[in-house]
Amino acid sequence: MPNDKLILLIQGKVLPEHRAELLQTIRETLPLTRAETGVELLYPTTRKDDPNTVVFFEVFSSQDAYDSHMQQEYVKRFFATIQGGLVGEPVVTTLSELS
């Protein structure tokens, strides 16, 4: 039986002057995202050795659930908020669950 889950590890370096705004935006959108159908896990963290590096661990039940998530207005606002607040592009790694 194939596993259709989409598992992502996303890491981005935040410009220090944008850190407070980004963290506030994460706090505002987190409960909305976790309540979405198909969002199995969304866990935002920062690196202990670099608090300006934000790392998200995300698990969606399927690609469709992820696509639906990305269409939510609060997700679009999140990305608009972080525009210009990161050092470069985030690194997105797609993972596979061990069976």
Regions found by a protein language model. Name each.
Residues 1-6, 43-52, 80-99:
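Glycine-rich beta-strand-turn "strand-cap" elements at beta-sheet edges
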Residues 17, 28, 49-51, 73:
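Short alpha-helical
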Residues 31-40, 59-93:
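An amphipathic, aromatic/His-enriched active-site/gating alpha helix that lines ligand/cofactor pockets
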